[in-house]
């Protein structure tokens, strides 16, 4: 009797285990993967996809940075070492996510994954900051005569000729169109996007950001009027305008892009400090108090609201809070080269840059995250 019951139990367990294994491989078969080793990797990648890279801590690492300020593609305003910044600790921090691993940037792996493809970073000067970082991370593994830079309208593109890969930047800080109207007045068209979006077609990976320009004060605003449909507005709640602009972008993505051909990522806002808050900072903040948390909750809520309405899968790529710890990473007064006398009498003033980031620096870690997202097929 005992033997009979044991056999029944054994057969039941076999059936259960068989169903589990089959269900796992059925799932993998749906994505067209017949190789069991690749199948296991696919499962690991899907688990990795659920990891939140934005939660973690900064750890000092002497092996960083991954390139130096001699990178020929760096803007002078971001080359803090060239501009005389005396400390270099800000270059030596890596981000350790709490619940998953974040590998060091591997230029050959990234280029191998992007072989024959285009990646375009679309947005404002903070996205240009990230583009320069990404180009510097990959260019050192390429022979000098096998890479080049080209320009087309608001875009600039770095090309790896051997990998047939292009890493592109498109200047579109508001995503929607900003045009001159009657009497040369600047009009922000909340429902028009094609003038910018025509450059996004045919790209394999699109990475967007848009936030800072929407909240510029009246003095620094880039437009005189808003236009939505046939209506013109002198004033509008910035977050209402932001939502309408993002909705126009979302509609364009869903109508014009094919999710099987183009992966879309939206990067959250890069935190910025006001006044002298980043001057003479040499280490990451140990914690974020209520007064040091980035002031971007409205933009985050609006962005999430719009993304939730979309059928097109968009990967939300969160760098805001992790970057808020890094006041030490901004150029501050080292956004330009200084004379010897200035170096000895440095003072923080209105000209301090507490928005952009020194390179090498924080955007390199953003690109480690971006590379991991792409390499693990998380998007």
Swiss-Prot record:
Query: Where's the motif DCXHWCLPGXXDXWN motif?
Result: 353-367
How this chain sits in the membrane, per its record, is: Single-pass type II membrane protein
State its location(s).
Membrane
Q: Which GO terms describe its molecular function?
A: O-acetyltransferase activity
Motif residue range(s): GDS motif: 123-125
- InterPro entries registered for this protein in UniProt: TBL, TBL_C, TBL_N
Tell me where the transmembrane regions lie.
8-24
Primary localization: membrane
Q: Does the record bear rRNA-binding in its keywords?
A: no
An annotated GO cellular component of this protein is:
membrane
Q: Does the keyword Transmembrane helix apply?
A: yes
Q: Name one Pfam family in it.
A: PMR5N
Superkingdom of the organism of origin = Eukaryota
Q: Which UniProt keywords apply?
A: Membrane, Signal-anchor, Transmembrane, Transmembrane helix
The UniProt function text for this chain reads: May act as a bridging protein that binds pectin and other cell wall polysaccharides. Probably involved in maintaining esterification of pectins. May be involved in the specific O-acetylation of cell wall polymers.
Record PANTHER family: PROTEIN TRICHOME BIREFRINGENCE-LIKE 36 (PTHR32285:SF155), PROTEIN TRICHOME BIREFRINGENCE-LIKE 9-RELATED (PTHR32285)
| Any further remark recorded for this protein | Contains 2 motifs that are conserved in esterases, but it is unlikely that this protein belongs to the catalytically active pectin esterases.
Give the family, as the similarity comment puts it.
Answer: Belongs to the PC-esterase family. TBL subfamily.
What this protein is called in its record is: Protein trichome birefringence-like 36
């Amino acid at each position: 009797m005992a033997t009979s019951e044991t056999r029944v139990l054994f057969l039941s367990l076999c059936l259960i285990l068989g169903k589990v294994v089959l269900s796992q491989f059925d799932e993998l078969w749906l994505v067209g993967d017949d190789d069991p080793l690749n199948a296991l990797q696919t499962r690991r990648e899907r688990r990795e996809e659920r990891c939140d890279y934005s939660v973690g801590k900064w750890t000092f690492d002497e092996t960083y940075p991954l390139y130096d300020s001699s990178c020929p593609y760096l803007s002078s305003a971001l080359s803090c070492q060239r501009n005389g910044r005396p400390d270099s600790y800000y270059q030596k921090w890596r981000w350790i996510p709490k619940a998953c691993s974040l590998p060091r940037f591997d230029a050959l792996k990234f280029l191998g994954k992007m072989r024959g493809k285009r990646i375009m970073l679309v947005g404002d000067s903070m996205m240009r900051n990230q583009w320069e970082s990404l180009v510097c991370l990959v260019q050192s593994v390429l022979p000098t005569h096998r890479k080049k830079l080209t320009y087309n309208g608001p875009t600039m593109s770095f090309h790896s000729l051997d990998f047939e890969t292009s890493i592109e930047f498109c200047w579109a800080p508001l995503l929607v169109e900003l045009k001159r109207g009657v009497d040369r007045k600047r009009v922000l068209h909340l429902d028009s996007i094609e003038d910018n979006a025509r450059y996004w077609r045919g790209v394999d990976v699109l990475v967007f950001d848009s936030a800072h320009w929407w909240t510029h004060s009246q003095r620094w605003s880039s437009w005189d009027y808003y236009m939505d449909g046939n209506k013109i507005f002198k004033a509008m709640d910035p977050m209402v305008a932001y939502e309408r602009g993002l909705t126009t972008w979302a509609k364009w993505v869903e109508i014009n892009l094919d999710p099987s051909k183009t992966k879309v990522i939206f990067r959250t806002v890069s935190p910025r400090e006001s006044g002298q808050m980043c001057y003479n900072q040499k280490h990451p903040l140990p914690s974020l108090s209520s007064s040091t948390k980035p002031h971007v909750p409205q933009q985050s809520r609006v962005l999430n609201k719009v993304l939730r309405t979309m059928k097109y899968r968009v990967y939300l790529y969160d760098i805001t809070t992790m970057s808020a710890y890094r006041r030490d990473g901004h150029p501050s007064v080292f956004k330009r080269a200084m004379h010897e006398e200035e170096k000895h009498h440095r003072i923080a003033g209105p000209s301090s840059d507490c928005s952009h980031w020194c390179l090498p620096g924080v955007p390199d870690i953003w690109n480690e995250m971006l590379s991991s997202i792409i390499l693990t097929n998380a998007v």
